Curated annotation (Swiss-Prot):
Pfam families with a match to the protein in the record: FSIP1
Region Disordered: start-end pairs: 1-111, 354-390
Biased composition regions of type Basic and acidic residues, renumbered to the chain: 53-72, 359-371, 378-390
Family annotation (InterPro entries): Fsip1
Superkingdom as given in the UniProt entry: Eukaryota
UniProt protein name: Fibrous sheath-interacting protein 1
Alphabetical UniProt keywords: Coiled coil, Phosphoprotein
Organism: Rattus norvegicus (Rat)
UniProt GO cellular component terms: acrosomal vesicle; nucleus; sperm head
Amino acid sequence: MSMDIIKGNLDGISKPASSSRSRPGSRSSNGSLEVLSPEPGPVKIDMVNKLNSGKEGHTSDSRVEERRKISDDEWADNPRSTEPAQESSDEDSNLSQPQGTPEHSDDPKLEGTDAVLQNAIHKMHRLDKILAKRRIREKEIKKQGLEMRIKLWEELKSAKNTEDLENDEELENTKKFLYLTSKSAGTAAEPLHCKFEDDLFSVFHTQIPQETYENHTEKDFTCDVEKNGPLIKTEKQPFSNTEAIEPRSEHSQVFIIRNAEHSQDFIKRNIELAKSSRSPVVMVEGEKKRLDELLKGLEDTDSGLSSSEGDQCAWLVPGEGYTLAATESQQLAEIDIKLQELSVDSPAVFSLESQSNKGDMEHDSNEERNTEPTPGEKILRDNKEQRDRESRLRAIDGKLKEINEQVEECPVITPGKRNERITWRWLLAKILEPECKV
C-alpha cells in the first residue's frame, strides 16, 4: 500500500480537492501543492499486513481516509493558523500514525492469541494426566472386582460341595445363582476373566488398534450387550455409576474372544453329533452282535412268509422248532382220517401225516449236517424243554405222594437186607411205571 504525502503552502485555498493534486515531481508557487514520493514503511508493517486478513486492511484504509478528511476540514477552517513547517510535520505525524497503529494494535492481539493457545495446551496436558490417573485407578478397581468375584465363586462352590449352608432356601438360591452365572458367564475361575486390557491381542490383522478402538466399537458393543446382558450386569455390580461409564474398550475384545471360542466349540459339537447321527442308541459290542443275529432271523422269516403256503415247512430247519408229541400226532392222524371220510367231495384236504412223514425223512437225511439255530427258534426250543421238565417234575411229585400214601397203608416189614432190597425195587417200579406206559 503506497500513499502520497502532500507538502506546500495552502494560502488562498478554501477547500482542497482530490483533482487539484499534481503529479509527482511537479513544482508550483506558494499557492501550489507539492507531491513527494512515499517513504518506505517499516518491515513490521508489511509482516502485519500479511498476517492480517483483507478486512483489517480495509479498515486501515478507511481510517487513513477519515483522518485525511478531518485534517482537510481543519485546514479549511483555520488556513493561516499554522506554519508550513508545522503543517508538514503534523501531516507527517498524522499520516505516519495510521501506519504505526497496526504495529501497536495487532502485536498484542497475536501475543494474546499465543497466550490463550499456550494456556489451552497446558490445560489439555493437565487434563490428560488426570485422565490417565483415573484410568489407572479404574483398572485397579476392576481388577479388584474380578478377584473378589473369583473368590466369591470359589466360596459358593465350596459351600455347595460341603453343604455348609444354613437352610434350604439359602441352598436353593445358591444353586440358582450358580446355574445362571455358569450359564451366562461361564466359570469365573477361567483365565479368560483374569485378562485385562494390557494382555489383550488382536484377533484379526485388520483390527483397529487399542488406542482408537473405543470410538469405533459403539455399534459392536450394543450387539454384545444384547447377547451378553447377564455377563455385563455381573461385571458392573462391584463398580459405582461413575466407574461403569466406560466399559467398552476393556470388555469388547473379551466378548469377541468369547464368541470366537463359543463358535469353535459349537463346530466341534456339531462334528461329534454328526459322527453319532446314524447310531442314536449307544450299544456295546455284544448288543450289536445280538441285534445282527436277530435281524438275520427276521430276514429269514420274511423270506419264508413271502413264499407260498405249500412251502411253509421248506424254510424250517429239520429237527428244530415246535414238534408234536406221539400221542398228539396219533390223535391228529385219527382226526384227519375222520375228516377224509366225512369230506369226500372236497378235493384238497390238508394231510398232517404226509407232512410229518416228509419232515421225518428230511430229518433223517440231514442228521449229519450241523446248522446253527436262529435266535428265535433257539428261544422257542428252550421254552419247550423247560415246560417239559416242569411237567415231568410235577408228575414225579404226584407219584411220590401216591407212593407215600401206599407205604403208610402197607403192613410193617421187619428190617433186613432182603426186605430193604424188595422195598426199593417196589418203589422204583412204581415210579417208573407211568414212564413205561407213555
